[in-house]
């Protein structure tokens, strides 16, 4: 017979249950969509929402509060927005946008909010960081002093880039801007630099080609691609560069070196303009909103070289700007030129004349990279910029005057060969020691009696000859990072010996 519970036992069980009872109340602040269109929703009822806070719509899409008005909130939707209609409910998530960071992202292609889009499965991220972070202050930084070799002769010799620098690549469409950036990424192989390529508003086919090119050269082993294509909502195109720089900052803050390419910030500004106009913010010059300068300055200021106390990491930025018919004085180009530490200017006239990379060395500058250039390159390229400028002047003059004196003719001949030396096929970056050798040969007159059309052949055969017969030359330049008398003597001997056997045919 079952044992009967005593009255006092029953009361003690009830008391225990009452004591253990926990009332869980889930408080959510929700609002209602008043209107929705073009990726922007007007929401009523979210009185305590923060600027930039993440919100969730009832269809699962996330949104970001950008306009905080008296009666409603302007929200950009980070998705397609299918299923959002007037009356849909929206709830606050109580946090700002975060992106996944860390080693798990290397070799992957992700979208603007850090989700993988390469079909290689989920990303096991161990850390998430806020997409909007404050740039390092003055005391946290150190002046740029280590070189970031691009592998492109014209850049490493004349417009050197240092780790932690922001160098703008600017030019018209189809002048080889992306190629310069991709070459730089390929050249970081074995340099322990993590590269991030951010594609904003590009055709998906173009991004696929870039990824394929990086894979072919083994560069995806240390590269992360962030893609917000032309078909994506403006909000995602606006966010992509910030997601990219957040990933780069993780490596910078952990004492590593990172390189980030923004391809391109013109389309980024257009996406932001689109969002701002739909949010009914007042337009300014060229219909861009008033804070379009801050849009790019807060992004590019996050690239920095940190001091030794903070781990001496660096984040180098290569923003790209597309100009219209070479107009560098438009709003966005002048903004970004004033934010960056120099610019590489690519010209369609040079490109069409077969001078590729089509860098105009006259107006391309690097404001801080000179301190990072290795001594050997400084020694051989010291007068190169001036020589090329004088050559351009003489060339223009020679079109009118037929009778040039001997010195001018020699200068013209030397200039033509130096221009030829600086040409380089795409996706074939050169190590700095090879660049030093060929520029040394040109600057010291070894090529004066070589046909201009044979310079390219001479250059690549010279590298092979030195590798076979005088490999110590490359090793010594790599180790000493300067040209001393011993290396110069060896170089002169090697070049003379090679010239004796070289045939231009």
From Swiss-Prot:
ATP binds at residues 171-178. It catalyses: ATP + H2O + 4 H(+)(in) = ADP + phosphate + 5 H(+)(out). Its EC number is 7.1.2.2. It is a peripheral membrane protein. InterPro entries: ATP_synth_asu-like_sf, ATP_synth_asu_C, ATP_synth_asu_C_sf, ATP_synth_F1_a_nt-bd_dom, ATP_synth_F1_asu, ATPase_a/bsu_AS, ATPase_F1/V1/A1_a/bsu_N, ATPase_F1/V1/A1_a/bsu_N_sf. Keywords: ATP synthesis, ATP-binding, Cell inner membrane, Cell membrane, CF(1), Hydrogen ion transport, Ion transport, Membrane, Nucleotide-binding, Translocase, Transport. This is ATP synthase subunit alpha. It comes from Nitratiruptor sp. (strain SB155-2). The gene is atpA.
